[in-house]
């Protein structure tokens, strides 16, 4: 198994050497199999495959303990049957890390689509600061 992993990493290094601007997300089974050999190579690491925005908040709040903020991909899934608060919650979860926008965006109401757009525009205004940011947990890790 170790030889297989090393062969894969060697192949991956060759891909990134040939295509240095290539961006590939490391899913790692929704972040469950994250390892530092992969983190050293991939610019994006999925933190979870979770779709429930209420539970994803804890994942987003703690992701900085294992990943750099600019590398930690936080999924934002506004649900087609959700409301405005759910849409806002989804966007806020992802703002301080790296937004992975998903869901049935074309099926959202105009108001909810505008909230997603506003969240992404705000994210674009702060994303250069994210890579210099340091995570802080004044009350300990979120539970």
What are these model-predicted stretches?
Residues 8-143:
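Active-site-proximal substrate-binding groove within the catalytic cores of carbohydrate-active enzymes
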